[in-house]
């Protein structure tokens, strides 16, 4: 069996070497010639897997070790009888950690009380749903916009217009889609961006084109009261440098790049491939993950929740380092910037998740226990 795989997928040999020969390539270099003799294709979000790419190839299974599927031609797969799998939720905790770290950084820069802000979460799936749980565990005011879930479940979901009108902080967690009633391409266009409240913060850690980047640049240039945090960009790996200069934090699509999340994505695709081949999944991720360097934290149960959040979050992640590395990469010509963007992702240093922490609460736990559980950490 011949496997073609993105070279940046972690634990490739550990999970897939026993299936057959692995041919590794940069994700953006996977083309028709590369898959001409492949049985299995393993990718990340940087590789568009289209009908044209796979035409004439023997590929029977496509696995993307990522949470999203907008880079996969699912209709084409169905017509060609190709099995596929993604890794829903694999990096959700890492993205939530990124958003929380960004909020703490913004609060420090702006000198504001996070508890006094109203939060709008757009998209309440694997990532957004977990973020909502954390914000509610903190006792903060949260509005949620998710039209597909509202149609399916009813509930207390609100419109995007209400989010724009009422929320001081807006965090985007939608997939990218161009068609249908819930299309998200340029969901925040110039008209909607101009509706942002005075002093609003906008965080996008979903897909770059969910926000019209040109319009966002223009609005940020005109309104100094707004703050933006962008981890994703239209036209990646090319970045709108002028827009990046106006963002309080900018990073190279690494919000979900925790060590745990990336390796979890590989494990999920391994399990899906085993199911496709009718083989037992005997390799366990827990046997491969290294021990975290910060394993346990003790907190006074009466601690202020924001202080506790800061201790737990900063213990595993601070986005300012990634922001600094990203800004250093935006020098030189366009070609150099594109290469630097991918290099930052390829050589991203190991980062663990709050979920891997064990937390001991001294005294009556009360509401702090709810926060720890919402963060995914383990109470001991």
UniProtKB/Swiss-Prot annotation:
Record InterPro entries: D-isomer_2_OHA_DH_cat_dom, D-isomer_DH_CS, D-isomer_DH_NAD-bd, Erythronate-4-P_DHase, Erythronate-4-P_DHase_dimer, NAD(P)-bd_dom_sf, PdxB_dimer_sf
Annotated residues for binding of substrate: 45, 66, 257
Keywords associated with the record: Cytoplasm, NAD, Oxidoreductase, Pyridoxine biosynthesis
Location in or out of the cell: Cytoplasm
Pfam families: 2-Hacid_dh, 2-Hacid_dh_C, DUF3410
Enzyme Commission designation: 1.1.1.290
Pathway where this protein functions: Cofactor biosynthesis; pyridoxine 5'-phosphate biosynthesis; pyridoxine 5'-phosphate from D-erythrose 4-phosphate: step 2/5
Active-site residues, Swiss-Prot/TrEMBL: 207, 236, 253
Domain of life, source organism: Bacteria
EC class (word): oxidoreductase
GO CC, alphabetical: cytosol
Gene Ontology terms: biological process: 'de novo' pyridoxal 5'-phosphate biosynthetic process; pyridoxine biosynthetic process
Molecular function terms from GO: 4-phosphoerythronate dehydrogenase activity; NAD binding; protein dimerization activity
Reactions catalysed according to its record: 4-phospho-D-erythronate + NAD(+) = (R)-3-hydroxy-2-oxo-4-phosphooxybutanoate + NADH + H(+)
Binding site for NAD(+): 126-127, 146, 174, 205-207, 231, 256
Role summary: Catalyzes the oxidation of erythronate-4-phosphate to 3-hydroxy-2-oxo-4-phosphonooxybutanoate.
Family: Belongs to the D-isomer specific 2-hydroxyacid dehydrogenase family. PdxB subfamily.
Subunit-level organization: Homodimer.
NCBIfam families in the cross-refs: PRK00257.1
Entry protein name: Erythronate-4-phosphate dehydrogenase
Taxon lineage: Bacteria, Pseudomonadati, Pseudomonadota, Gammaproteobacteria, Pseudomonadales
Gene: pdxB
């Amino acid at each position: 069996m011949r496997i073609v795989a993105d070279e940046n997928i972690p634990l490739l040999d550990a999970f897939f070497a026993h299936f057959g020969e692995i041919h590794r390539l940069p994700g953006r270099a996977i083309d028709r010639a590369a898959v001409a003799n492949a049985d299995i294709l393993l990718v990340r979000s940087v590789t568009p897997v289209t009908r044209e790419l796979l035409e004439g190839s023997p590929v029977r299974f496509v696995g993307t070790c990522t949470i999203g599927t907008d880079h996969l031609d699912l209709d084409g797969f169905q017509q060609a009888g190709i099995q596929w799998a993604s890794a829903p939720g694999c990096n959700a905790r890492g993205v939530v950690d990124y958003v929380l770290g960004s909020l703490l950084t913004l609060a420090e820069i702006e000198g504001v009380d996070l508890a006094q802000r109203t939060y709008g979460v757009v998209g309440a799936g694997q990532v957004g749903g977990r973020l909502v749980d954390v914000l509610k565990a903190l006792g903060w005011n949260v509005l949620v916009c998710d039209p597909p879930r509202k149609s399916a479940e009813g509930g207390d979901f609100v419109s995007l217009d209400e989010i724009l009108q009422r929320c001081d902080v807006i965090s985007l967690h939608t997939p990218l889609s161009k068609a249908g009633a819930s299309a998200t391409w340029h969901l925040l266009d110039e008209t909607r961006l101009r509706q942002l409240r005075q002093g609003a913060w906008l965080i996008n850690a979903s897909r770059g084109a969910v926000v019209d980047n040109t319009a966002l640049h223009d609005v940020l240039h005109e309104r100094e009261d707004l703050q933006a945090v962008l981890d994703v960009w239209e036209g990646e790996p090319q970045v709108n440098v002028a827009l990046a200069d106006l963002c309080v934090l900018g990073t190279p699509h690494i919000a979900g790049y925790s060590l745990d999340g990336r390796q979890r994505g590989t494990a999920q695709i391994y399990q899906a491939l085993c199911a496709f081949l009718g083989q037992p999944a005997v390799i366990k991720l827990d046997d491969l993950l290294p021990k975290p360097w910060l394993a346990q934290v003790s907190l006074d149960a009466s601690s202020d929740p924001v202080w506790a959040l800061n201790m737990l979050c900063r213990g595993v992640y601070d986005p300012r380092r990634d922001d600094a590395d990203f800004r250093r990469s935006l020098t030189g010509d366009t070609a150099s910037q594109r290469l630097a963007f991918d290099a930052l992702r390829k050589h991203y240093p190991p980062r663990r998740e709050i979920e891997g922490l064990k937390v001991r609460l001294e005294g009556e736990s009360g509401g702090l226990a709810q926060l720890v559980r919402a963060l995914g950490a383990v109470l001991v």
